[in-house]
Amino acid sequence: MAVFKPFRAVRPIPEYASRVAALPYDVMNSDEAREMVKGNPYSFLHVDKAEVDLPVGTELYSEAVYNKAAENLQKLETDGICKQDKSDCMYIYRQIMDGRSQTGLVGCVSIDDYMNNVIKKHELTRADKEQDRINHVDYCDANTGPIFLTYRDNAAVGDIVKAWQAEHEPVYDFVSDGVAQTVWVIDCPETIKKLSSLFAGIDSLYIADGHHRAASAVKVGKKRREQNPGYTGNEEFNFFLAVLFAQSELAIMDYNRVIKDLNGLTQDEFIAKISESFTVESAPESPYKPQEKHTFGMYLGGKWYKLTAKDGTFDASDPVAALDVSILQRNLISPVLGIDDPRTDKRIDFVGGIRGLKELERRAQSDMCLAFSMFPTTVDDLMNIADACKIMPPKSTWFEPKLLSGLFVHKLK
């Protein structure tokens, strides 16, 4: 019984949409953000990474940054660059990258659904990162970036979305960094009611990406409830901004590993050691991208190998233990290379599949010495782990394209 409701988005007027829309705050650092906003006073990074408008070296989690974010968000409205829709709407958001499209529905989901596990999680969050987004949402009095959610395919929802796209013109249609971004507004109360009713029949929503933003939005909502003991449950602070994608719309990319050294072993010793848990053979092609679960590409000494996990090296009945990232970590990266905590160990780094396998070769020939190419985690894997109330290992999933910020803002009042 998932709650999915319309809202009055604050969004750019069409002629400014491509200039306002920006990559999410957590895919670049402050210096990169400063470069990206040069010559563009309308970029949403002025809101999401407001330190770009403050002196270099400003403490990122300072009150000055959050105040500036709120000021810049208000300015976009005051200057007429962004306007709030006059009625509650839902929105269709389609992205096309490298010929593959993903289409989602934009609306609001319930903080209660998050707390009672209708919205399921698969990742741990860090208190410091949560607090940053809590402050950001609180000061801006808005959700400024959508949470990326998925759900098991529902044909009726898909039919409504396709029919609306066929019968209506988009309000935004532009290309950003090679990704086509198209948005339709669903402003028909009857269609909105149908969609809300269909989602009420869906048991679970799953966070694909944005665990920190979701946790923060919920904590702000709970805080507002405490400040307003007479709340009805219908106030906007009881809901947060999300884009919902059917499972079949999504493709998770590989999230690859590069390692600094062989932990004191020679190449021959290393291969002998890993052969206890994996079948090691020359890769059928170079570079090598695994074609099925429980197989891995390994680049070492200028050569690609294919690794296959041996029977008995993992528990196939455990959705976490059976993940390829877990198999590699438990049978090779930890026992052979001595990297027990991949979150903190400086001898390991992670390379998103968007960078390609040639990047693995480059890293292994420069600052690292060893690389592993992974078979991508599937959306099914993610859902099974969340259903079992378990946590995925770090760096298990890489989603592309990224959802842009600035096209939809959800005000909490």
Where are these regions (language model features)?
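Surface-exposed, charge/polar-rich loops and edge strands
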Residues: 1-413
